[in-house]
C-alpha cells in the first residue's frame, strides 16, 4: 500500500469532512398487502424490523473498522399507497405510525416510502395517501413522504400538482410549533428514481429486488480542497481535478456498500454519487462554485460552474463503481449549505437563480423557506415549474419547500442537525391561482416518444 494514499484518505476524512452520508436498505412490502389494515400493518412492522435488524449495528462496525464516518442509517420501503390501497380505510395515518414505530425499534435515522406515484393519475389509494400526508408527518418523527407528479413519458399531472400545494400548506400549519418542519420531510418529484438512498425522497421501487443496499456518499469539502491546489488554471484542469476526486470518493462508497451488502447478506444496489453538503463550514457545494471563480454563488457564471461540477462528478464516479444510480449529482439545498445560506442573506442568490441552477444539477428547489402566508396556488405553480424542467430535460427534479408559519422575508428558520437554518426567501407575489386551478394533464414532450 502507498503510504501517501493512506495519509491522503485520513486527511480527507478528518480535515475535509469526507463521509458516507447514508447506508439505506430498500425493503419490498408487496408481500404485506392485506385487505385487513391491522394485519397489513403487523406484516409491515415485522418485515421491516426483521429485514433491517442488523443495519445500524453493521453500519457502526464498518465505521469503527474502516474509520469512515457513516452519518445516517436509513430504510426505504415500497410506496405505501400501493400497499394500503388494498384496504377499505379512509386514512393511512396508522400506516405512517407503524413505519415510525419500526424506525424507532431499529434505531435508524429516517424511513422513506410514505409515497404515491401519480404522474399520470391517481388511484383510490393514492388519493387517500396524499390526503393523509399532513397529519402523518405531524405525528411521526422519522417518516418521510414523497409524491411523483410527472415524468418524461407521461407528462405532468396538474391535478396532483394543485393538490400538493394545499398539502404542503396544511403540513406546515400542522407543524407550526416547529416552524413547518413537517415540510422538510416531504418531497414532490418529477421523474423520481426507484433506488434513491437520500431522504426525504427515498422509496423502494416495485422493479427493485426483495431487499437492496444503496449508499450515498458526500464530499464537497474534499472537492473544494482539491480545487484550491489548481487556482488560476484552466477549466480543463478544474474538470479533471473534480473527476479524479469524485473517483476517490466513490471508491470509498463502493467499499462500504459491498461490505454492508456482504455482512447483511443483502444484494448491493447502487452508489449515489451526489455531493451532499452539510451546514458545517467547509462542507459546502456553494464554496466549490466560489473556488471555481465566483465571488459569491448566485452571480453570473454560477450555472456554468455548477453544470461542469455536476458532469465531472458523474464522469469520475462511473469509473469508480460498477453500479451507479439514485440522483447522482450536486445537491443545492439552501438550509443545509453554509455558502448558500450566506449568499441568500447577502442578496446574491434568489429563487429565480436557484430554479436556473436546478436545470443542470440534482435535484431541485430543496430546503427553501418561503413566507408563511404564501398561497397554496403559488406553491403549486413552483412545483409545476420544477416538474416542467425535469420532464422536458429528462431528469429528476423536485421541490422541498417550507412555507414557514408566521415568518416573513428575511427571517431565519432553525431546523437543527443536518437540515440547518433557512433564510426566508422572497417569492414573486403575482397570482398563479387561475393557472393552478385548471387541472388536467400537461402532455408528455414530443421527444419522449423513443420507441
Curated annotation (Swiss-Prot):
Pfam family of the protein (one): DUF711
InterPro entries for the chain: UPF0210 (IPR007841)
Gene3D superfamilies the UniProt entry points to: 3.20.70.20
Subunit description: Homodimer.
NCBIfam families: PRK05313.1
Protein family membership: Belongs to the UPF0210 family.
UniProt-recorded name of the protein: UPF0210 protein CLH_1879
Source organism of the structure: Clostridium botulinum (strain Alaska E43 / Type E3)
Amino acid at each position: 500500500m502507498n503510504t501517501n494514499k493512506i495519509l491522503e484518505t485520513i486527511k480527507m476524512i478528518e480535515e475535509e469532512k469526507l463521509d458516507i452520508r447514508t447506508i439505506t436498505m430498500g425493503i419490498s412490502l408487496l408481500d404485506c398487502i392485506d385487505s385487513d389494515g391491522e394485519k397489513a400493518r403487523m406484516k409491515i412492522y415485522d418485515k421491516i424490523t426483521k429485514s433491517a435488524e442488523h443495519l445500524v449495528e453493521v453500519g457502526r462496525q464498518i465505521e469503527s473498522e474502516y474509520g469512515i464516518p457513516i452519518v445516517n442509517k436509513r430504510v426505504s420501503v415500497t410506496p405505501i399507497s400501493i400497499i394500503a390501497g388494498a384496504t377499505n380505510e379512509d386514512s393511512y395515518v396508522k400506516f405512517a405510525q407503524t413505519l415510525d414505530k419500526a424506525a424507532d425499534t431499529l434505531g435508524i435515522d429516517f424511513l422513506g416510502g410514505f409515497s404515491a406515484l401519480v404522474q399520470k393519475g391517481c388511484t383510490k389509494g393514492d388519493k387517500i395517501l396524499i390526503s393523509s400526508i399532513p397529519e402523518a408527518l405531524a405525528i411521526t418523527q422519522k417518516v418521510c413522504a414523497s409524491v411523483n407528479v410527472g415524468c418524461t413519458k407521461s407528462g405532468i399531472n396538474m391535478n396532483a400538482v394543485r393538490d400538493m400545494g394545499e398539502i404542503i400548506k396544511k403540513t406546515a400549519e400542522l407543524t407550526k410549533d416547529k416552524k413547518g418542519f413537517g415540510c422538510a420531510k416531504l418531497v414532490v418529484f418529477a421523474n423520481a428514481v426507484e433506488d434513491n438512498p437520500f431522504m426525504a425522497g427515498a422509496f423502494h421501487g416495485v422493479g427493485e429486488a426483495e431487499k437492496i443496499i444503496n449508499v450515498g456518499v458526500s464530499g464537497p469539502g474534499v472537492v473544494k480542497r482539491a480545487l484550491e491546489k489548481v487556482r488560476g488554471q484552466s477549466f480543463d484542469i478544474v474538470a479533471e481535478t473534480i473527476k479524479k476526486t469524485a473517483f476517490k470518493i466513490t471508491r470509498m462508497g463502493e467499499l462500504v456498500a459491498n461490505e454492508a451488502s456482504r455482512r447483511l447478506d443483502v444484494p448491493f444496489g447502487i452508489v449515489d454519487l451526489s455531493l451532499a453538503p452539510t451546514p458545517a463550514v467547509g462542507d459546502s457545494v456553494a464554496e466549490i462554485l466560489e473556488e471555481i471563480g465566483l465571488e459569491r454563488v448566485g452571480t453570473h457564471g454560477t450555472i456554468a460552474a455548477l453544470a461542469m461540477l455536476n458532469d465531472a462528478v458523474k464522469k469520475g464516479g462511473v469509473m469508480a463503481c460498477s453500479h451507479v444510480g439514485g440522483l447522482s449529482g450536486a445537491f443545492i439545498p439552501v438550509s443545509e449549505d453554509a455558502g448558500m445560506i450566506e449568499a441568500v442573506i447577502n442578496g446574491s442568490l434568489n429563487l429565480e437563480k436557484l430554479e436556473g441552477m436546478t436545470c443542470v444539477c440534482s435535484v431541485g428547489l430543496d430546503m427553501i423557506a418561503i413566507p408563511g402566508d404564501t398561497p397554496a396556488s403559488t406553491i403549486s405553480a413552483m412545483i409545476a415549474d420544477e416538474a416542467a424542467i425535469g420532464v422536458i430535460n429528462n431528469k429528476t427534479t423536485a421541490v422541498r419547500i417550507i412555507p414557514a408559519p408566521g415568518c416573513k422575508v428575511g427571517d431565519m428558520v432553525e431546523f437543527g442537525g443536518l437540515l440547518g437554518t433557512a433564510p426566508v426567501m422572497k417569492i414573486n407575489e403575482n397570482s398563479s391561482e387561475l393557472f393552478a386551478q385548471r387541472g388536467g394533464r400537461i402532455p408528455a414532450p414530443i421527444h419522449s416518444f423513443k420507441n
